[in-house]
Amino acid sequence: MADRRVLFVHAHPDDESIETGATIARYAAEGAHVTLVTCTLGEEGEIIPPELAHHAADRDDTLGRYRIGELAAACAALGVTDHRFLGGVGRWRDSGMMGAPSNLRPDCFWQADLDEAAAELVKVIREVRPQVLVTYDENGTYGHPDHIKAHRVSWRAYELAADPAFPGGEPWRIAKVYHTAQPRSVLRRGVEAMRGADMPFTRVASVDELPFGCDDAQVTTEIDARAHLPAKFAALRAHATQVMVHEPWFALSNGIGREVLGVEFFTLKAGTPGPRVAGVPAGEGGLGGPRLLETDLFAGIG
């Protein structure tokens, strides 16, 4: 068993690459055991290439199966060799955006029984025994029901996995739990850089137009994975039904450009913080400023 083991829990194929791709690639390259759990197949996603539009949920409804291949290619690019779908392939369906009729499907992830879904994640935790768990914040980053449910399932599994009274395998206490974070100052720099950039995507006028972002003060941890940007770009390109790439930018089906980050940010929500040091300067993609940050998800773990 590898000395360092980290579990990433994401809602759909492509989320792992967009939010944590560089971090995943860095730890995989360093020899850590990286486990990726994806909660749905992403069946309700909007499709970018016209020639693949027939896979859509309101047509052939085969997008989920197609995206399995995209995710496999992304995992290969990132160096992930341990990937699982929560509860098995297709156990829970993509719920679609908040308020969509697909939220009401009994087989969608949003409608999943919390303890039932968490029990499936407990199986993974007790098998892999990760020291670190990474998932989303309470709002699921931007309010998507599957992201919110992934957050809830992750935290319930974190509790149950450590409970000796919960059946199925030896208990395991995860040492540190992180939420992904997208600090507004970093997003603001990206918005400003796009104003004069040569790219085919839509530019937003202000960071306030983006449906995500957190106060800089919430960030506790900064992972410098700039050396692994090529892997992140390759993983993003693998998700061709969902992502368009024009380095150093990318866009989803809404066409709004965003910067691909090689420095990724997190908030420690459970566990003891490790040593904090000066991070990457703001001019090089980091948070910058006088605050000291963790620079390793495993910092402080004995």
UniProtKB/Swiss-Prot annotation:
EC number: 3.5.1.103
Molecular function GO labels: N-acetylglucosaminylinositol deacetylase activity; zinc ion binding
Cofactor(s) needed by this chain: Zn(2+)
Cofactor binding note of this UniProt entry: Binds 1 zinc ion per subunit.
Keywords: Hydrolase, Metal-binding, Zinc
Cysteine-cysteine disulfides: none
Pfam families associated with the record: PIG-L
GO biological process: mycothiol biosynthetic process
Catalytic reaction equation(s): 1D-myo-inositol 2-acetamido-2-deoxy-alpha-D-glucopyranoside + H2O = 1D-myo-inositol 2-amino-2-deoxy-alpha-D-glucopyranoside + acetate
Matching InterPro entries: GlcNAc_PI_deacetylase-related (IPR003737), LmbE-like_dom_sf (IPR024078), Mycothiol_biosynthesis_MshB (IPR017810)
Chain positions recorded as Zn(2+) binding sites: 12, 15, 147
Task of the protein: Catalyzes the deacetylation of 1D-myo-inositol 2-acetamido-2-deoxy-alpha-D-glucopyranoside (GlcNAc-Ins) in the mycothiol biosynthesis pathway.
Listed PANTHER family: 1D-MYO-INOSITOL 2-ACETAMIDO-2-DEOXY-ALPHA-D-GLUCOPYRANOSIDE DEACETYLASE, N-ACETYLGLUCOSAMINYL-PHOSPHATIDYLINOSITOL DE-N-ACETYLASE-RELATED
NCBIfam families given in the database record: mycothiol_MshB (TIGR03445)
Family that this chain belongs to: Belongs to the MshB deacetylase family.
Protein's recorded name: 1D-myo-inositol 2-acetamido-2-deoxy-alpha-D-glucopyranoside deacetylase
Native source species: Thermobispora bispora (strain ATCC 19993 / DSM 43833 / CBS 139.67 / JCM 10125 / KCTC 9307 / NBRC 14880 / R51)
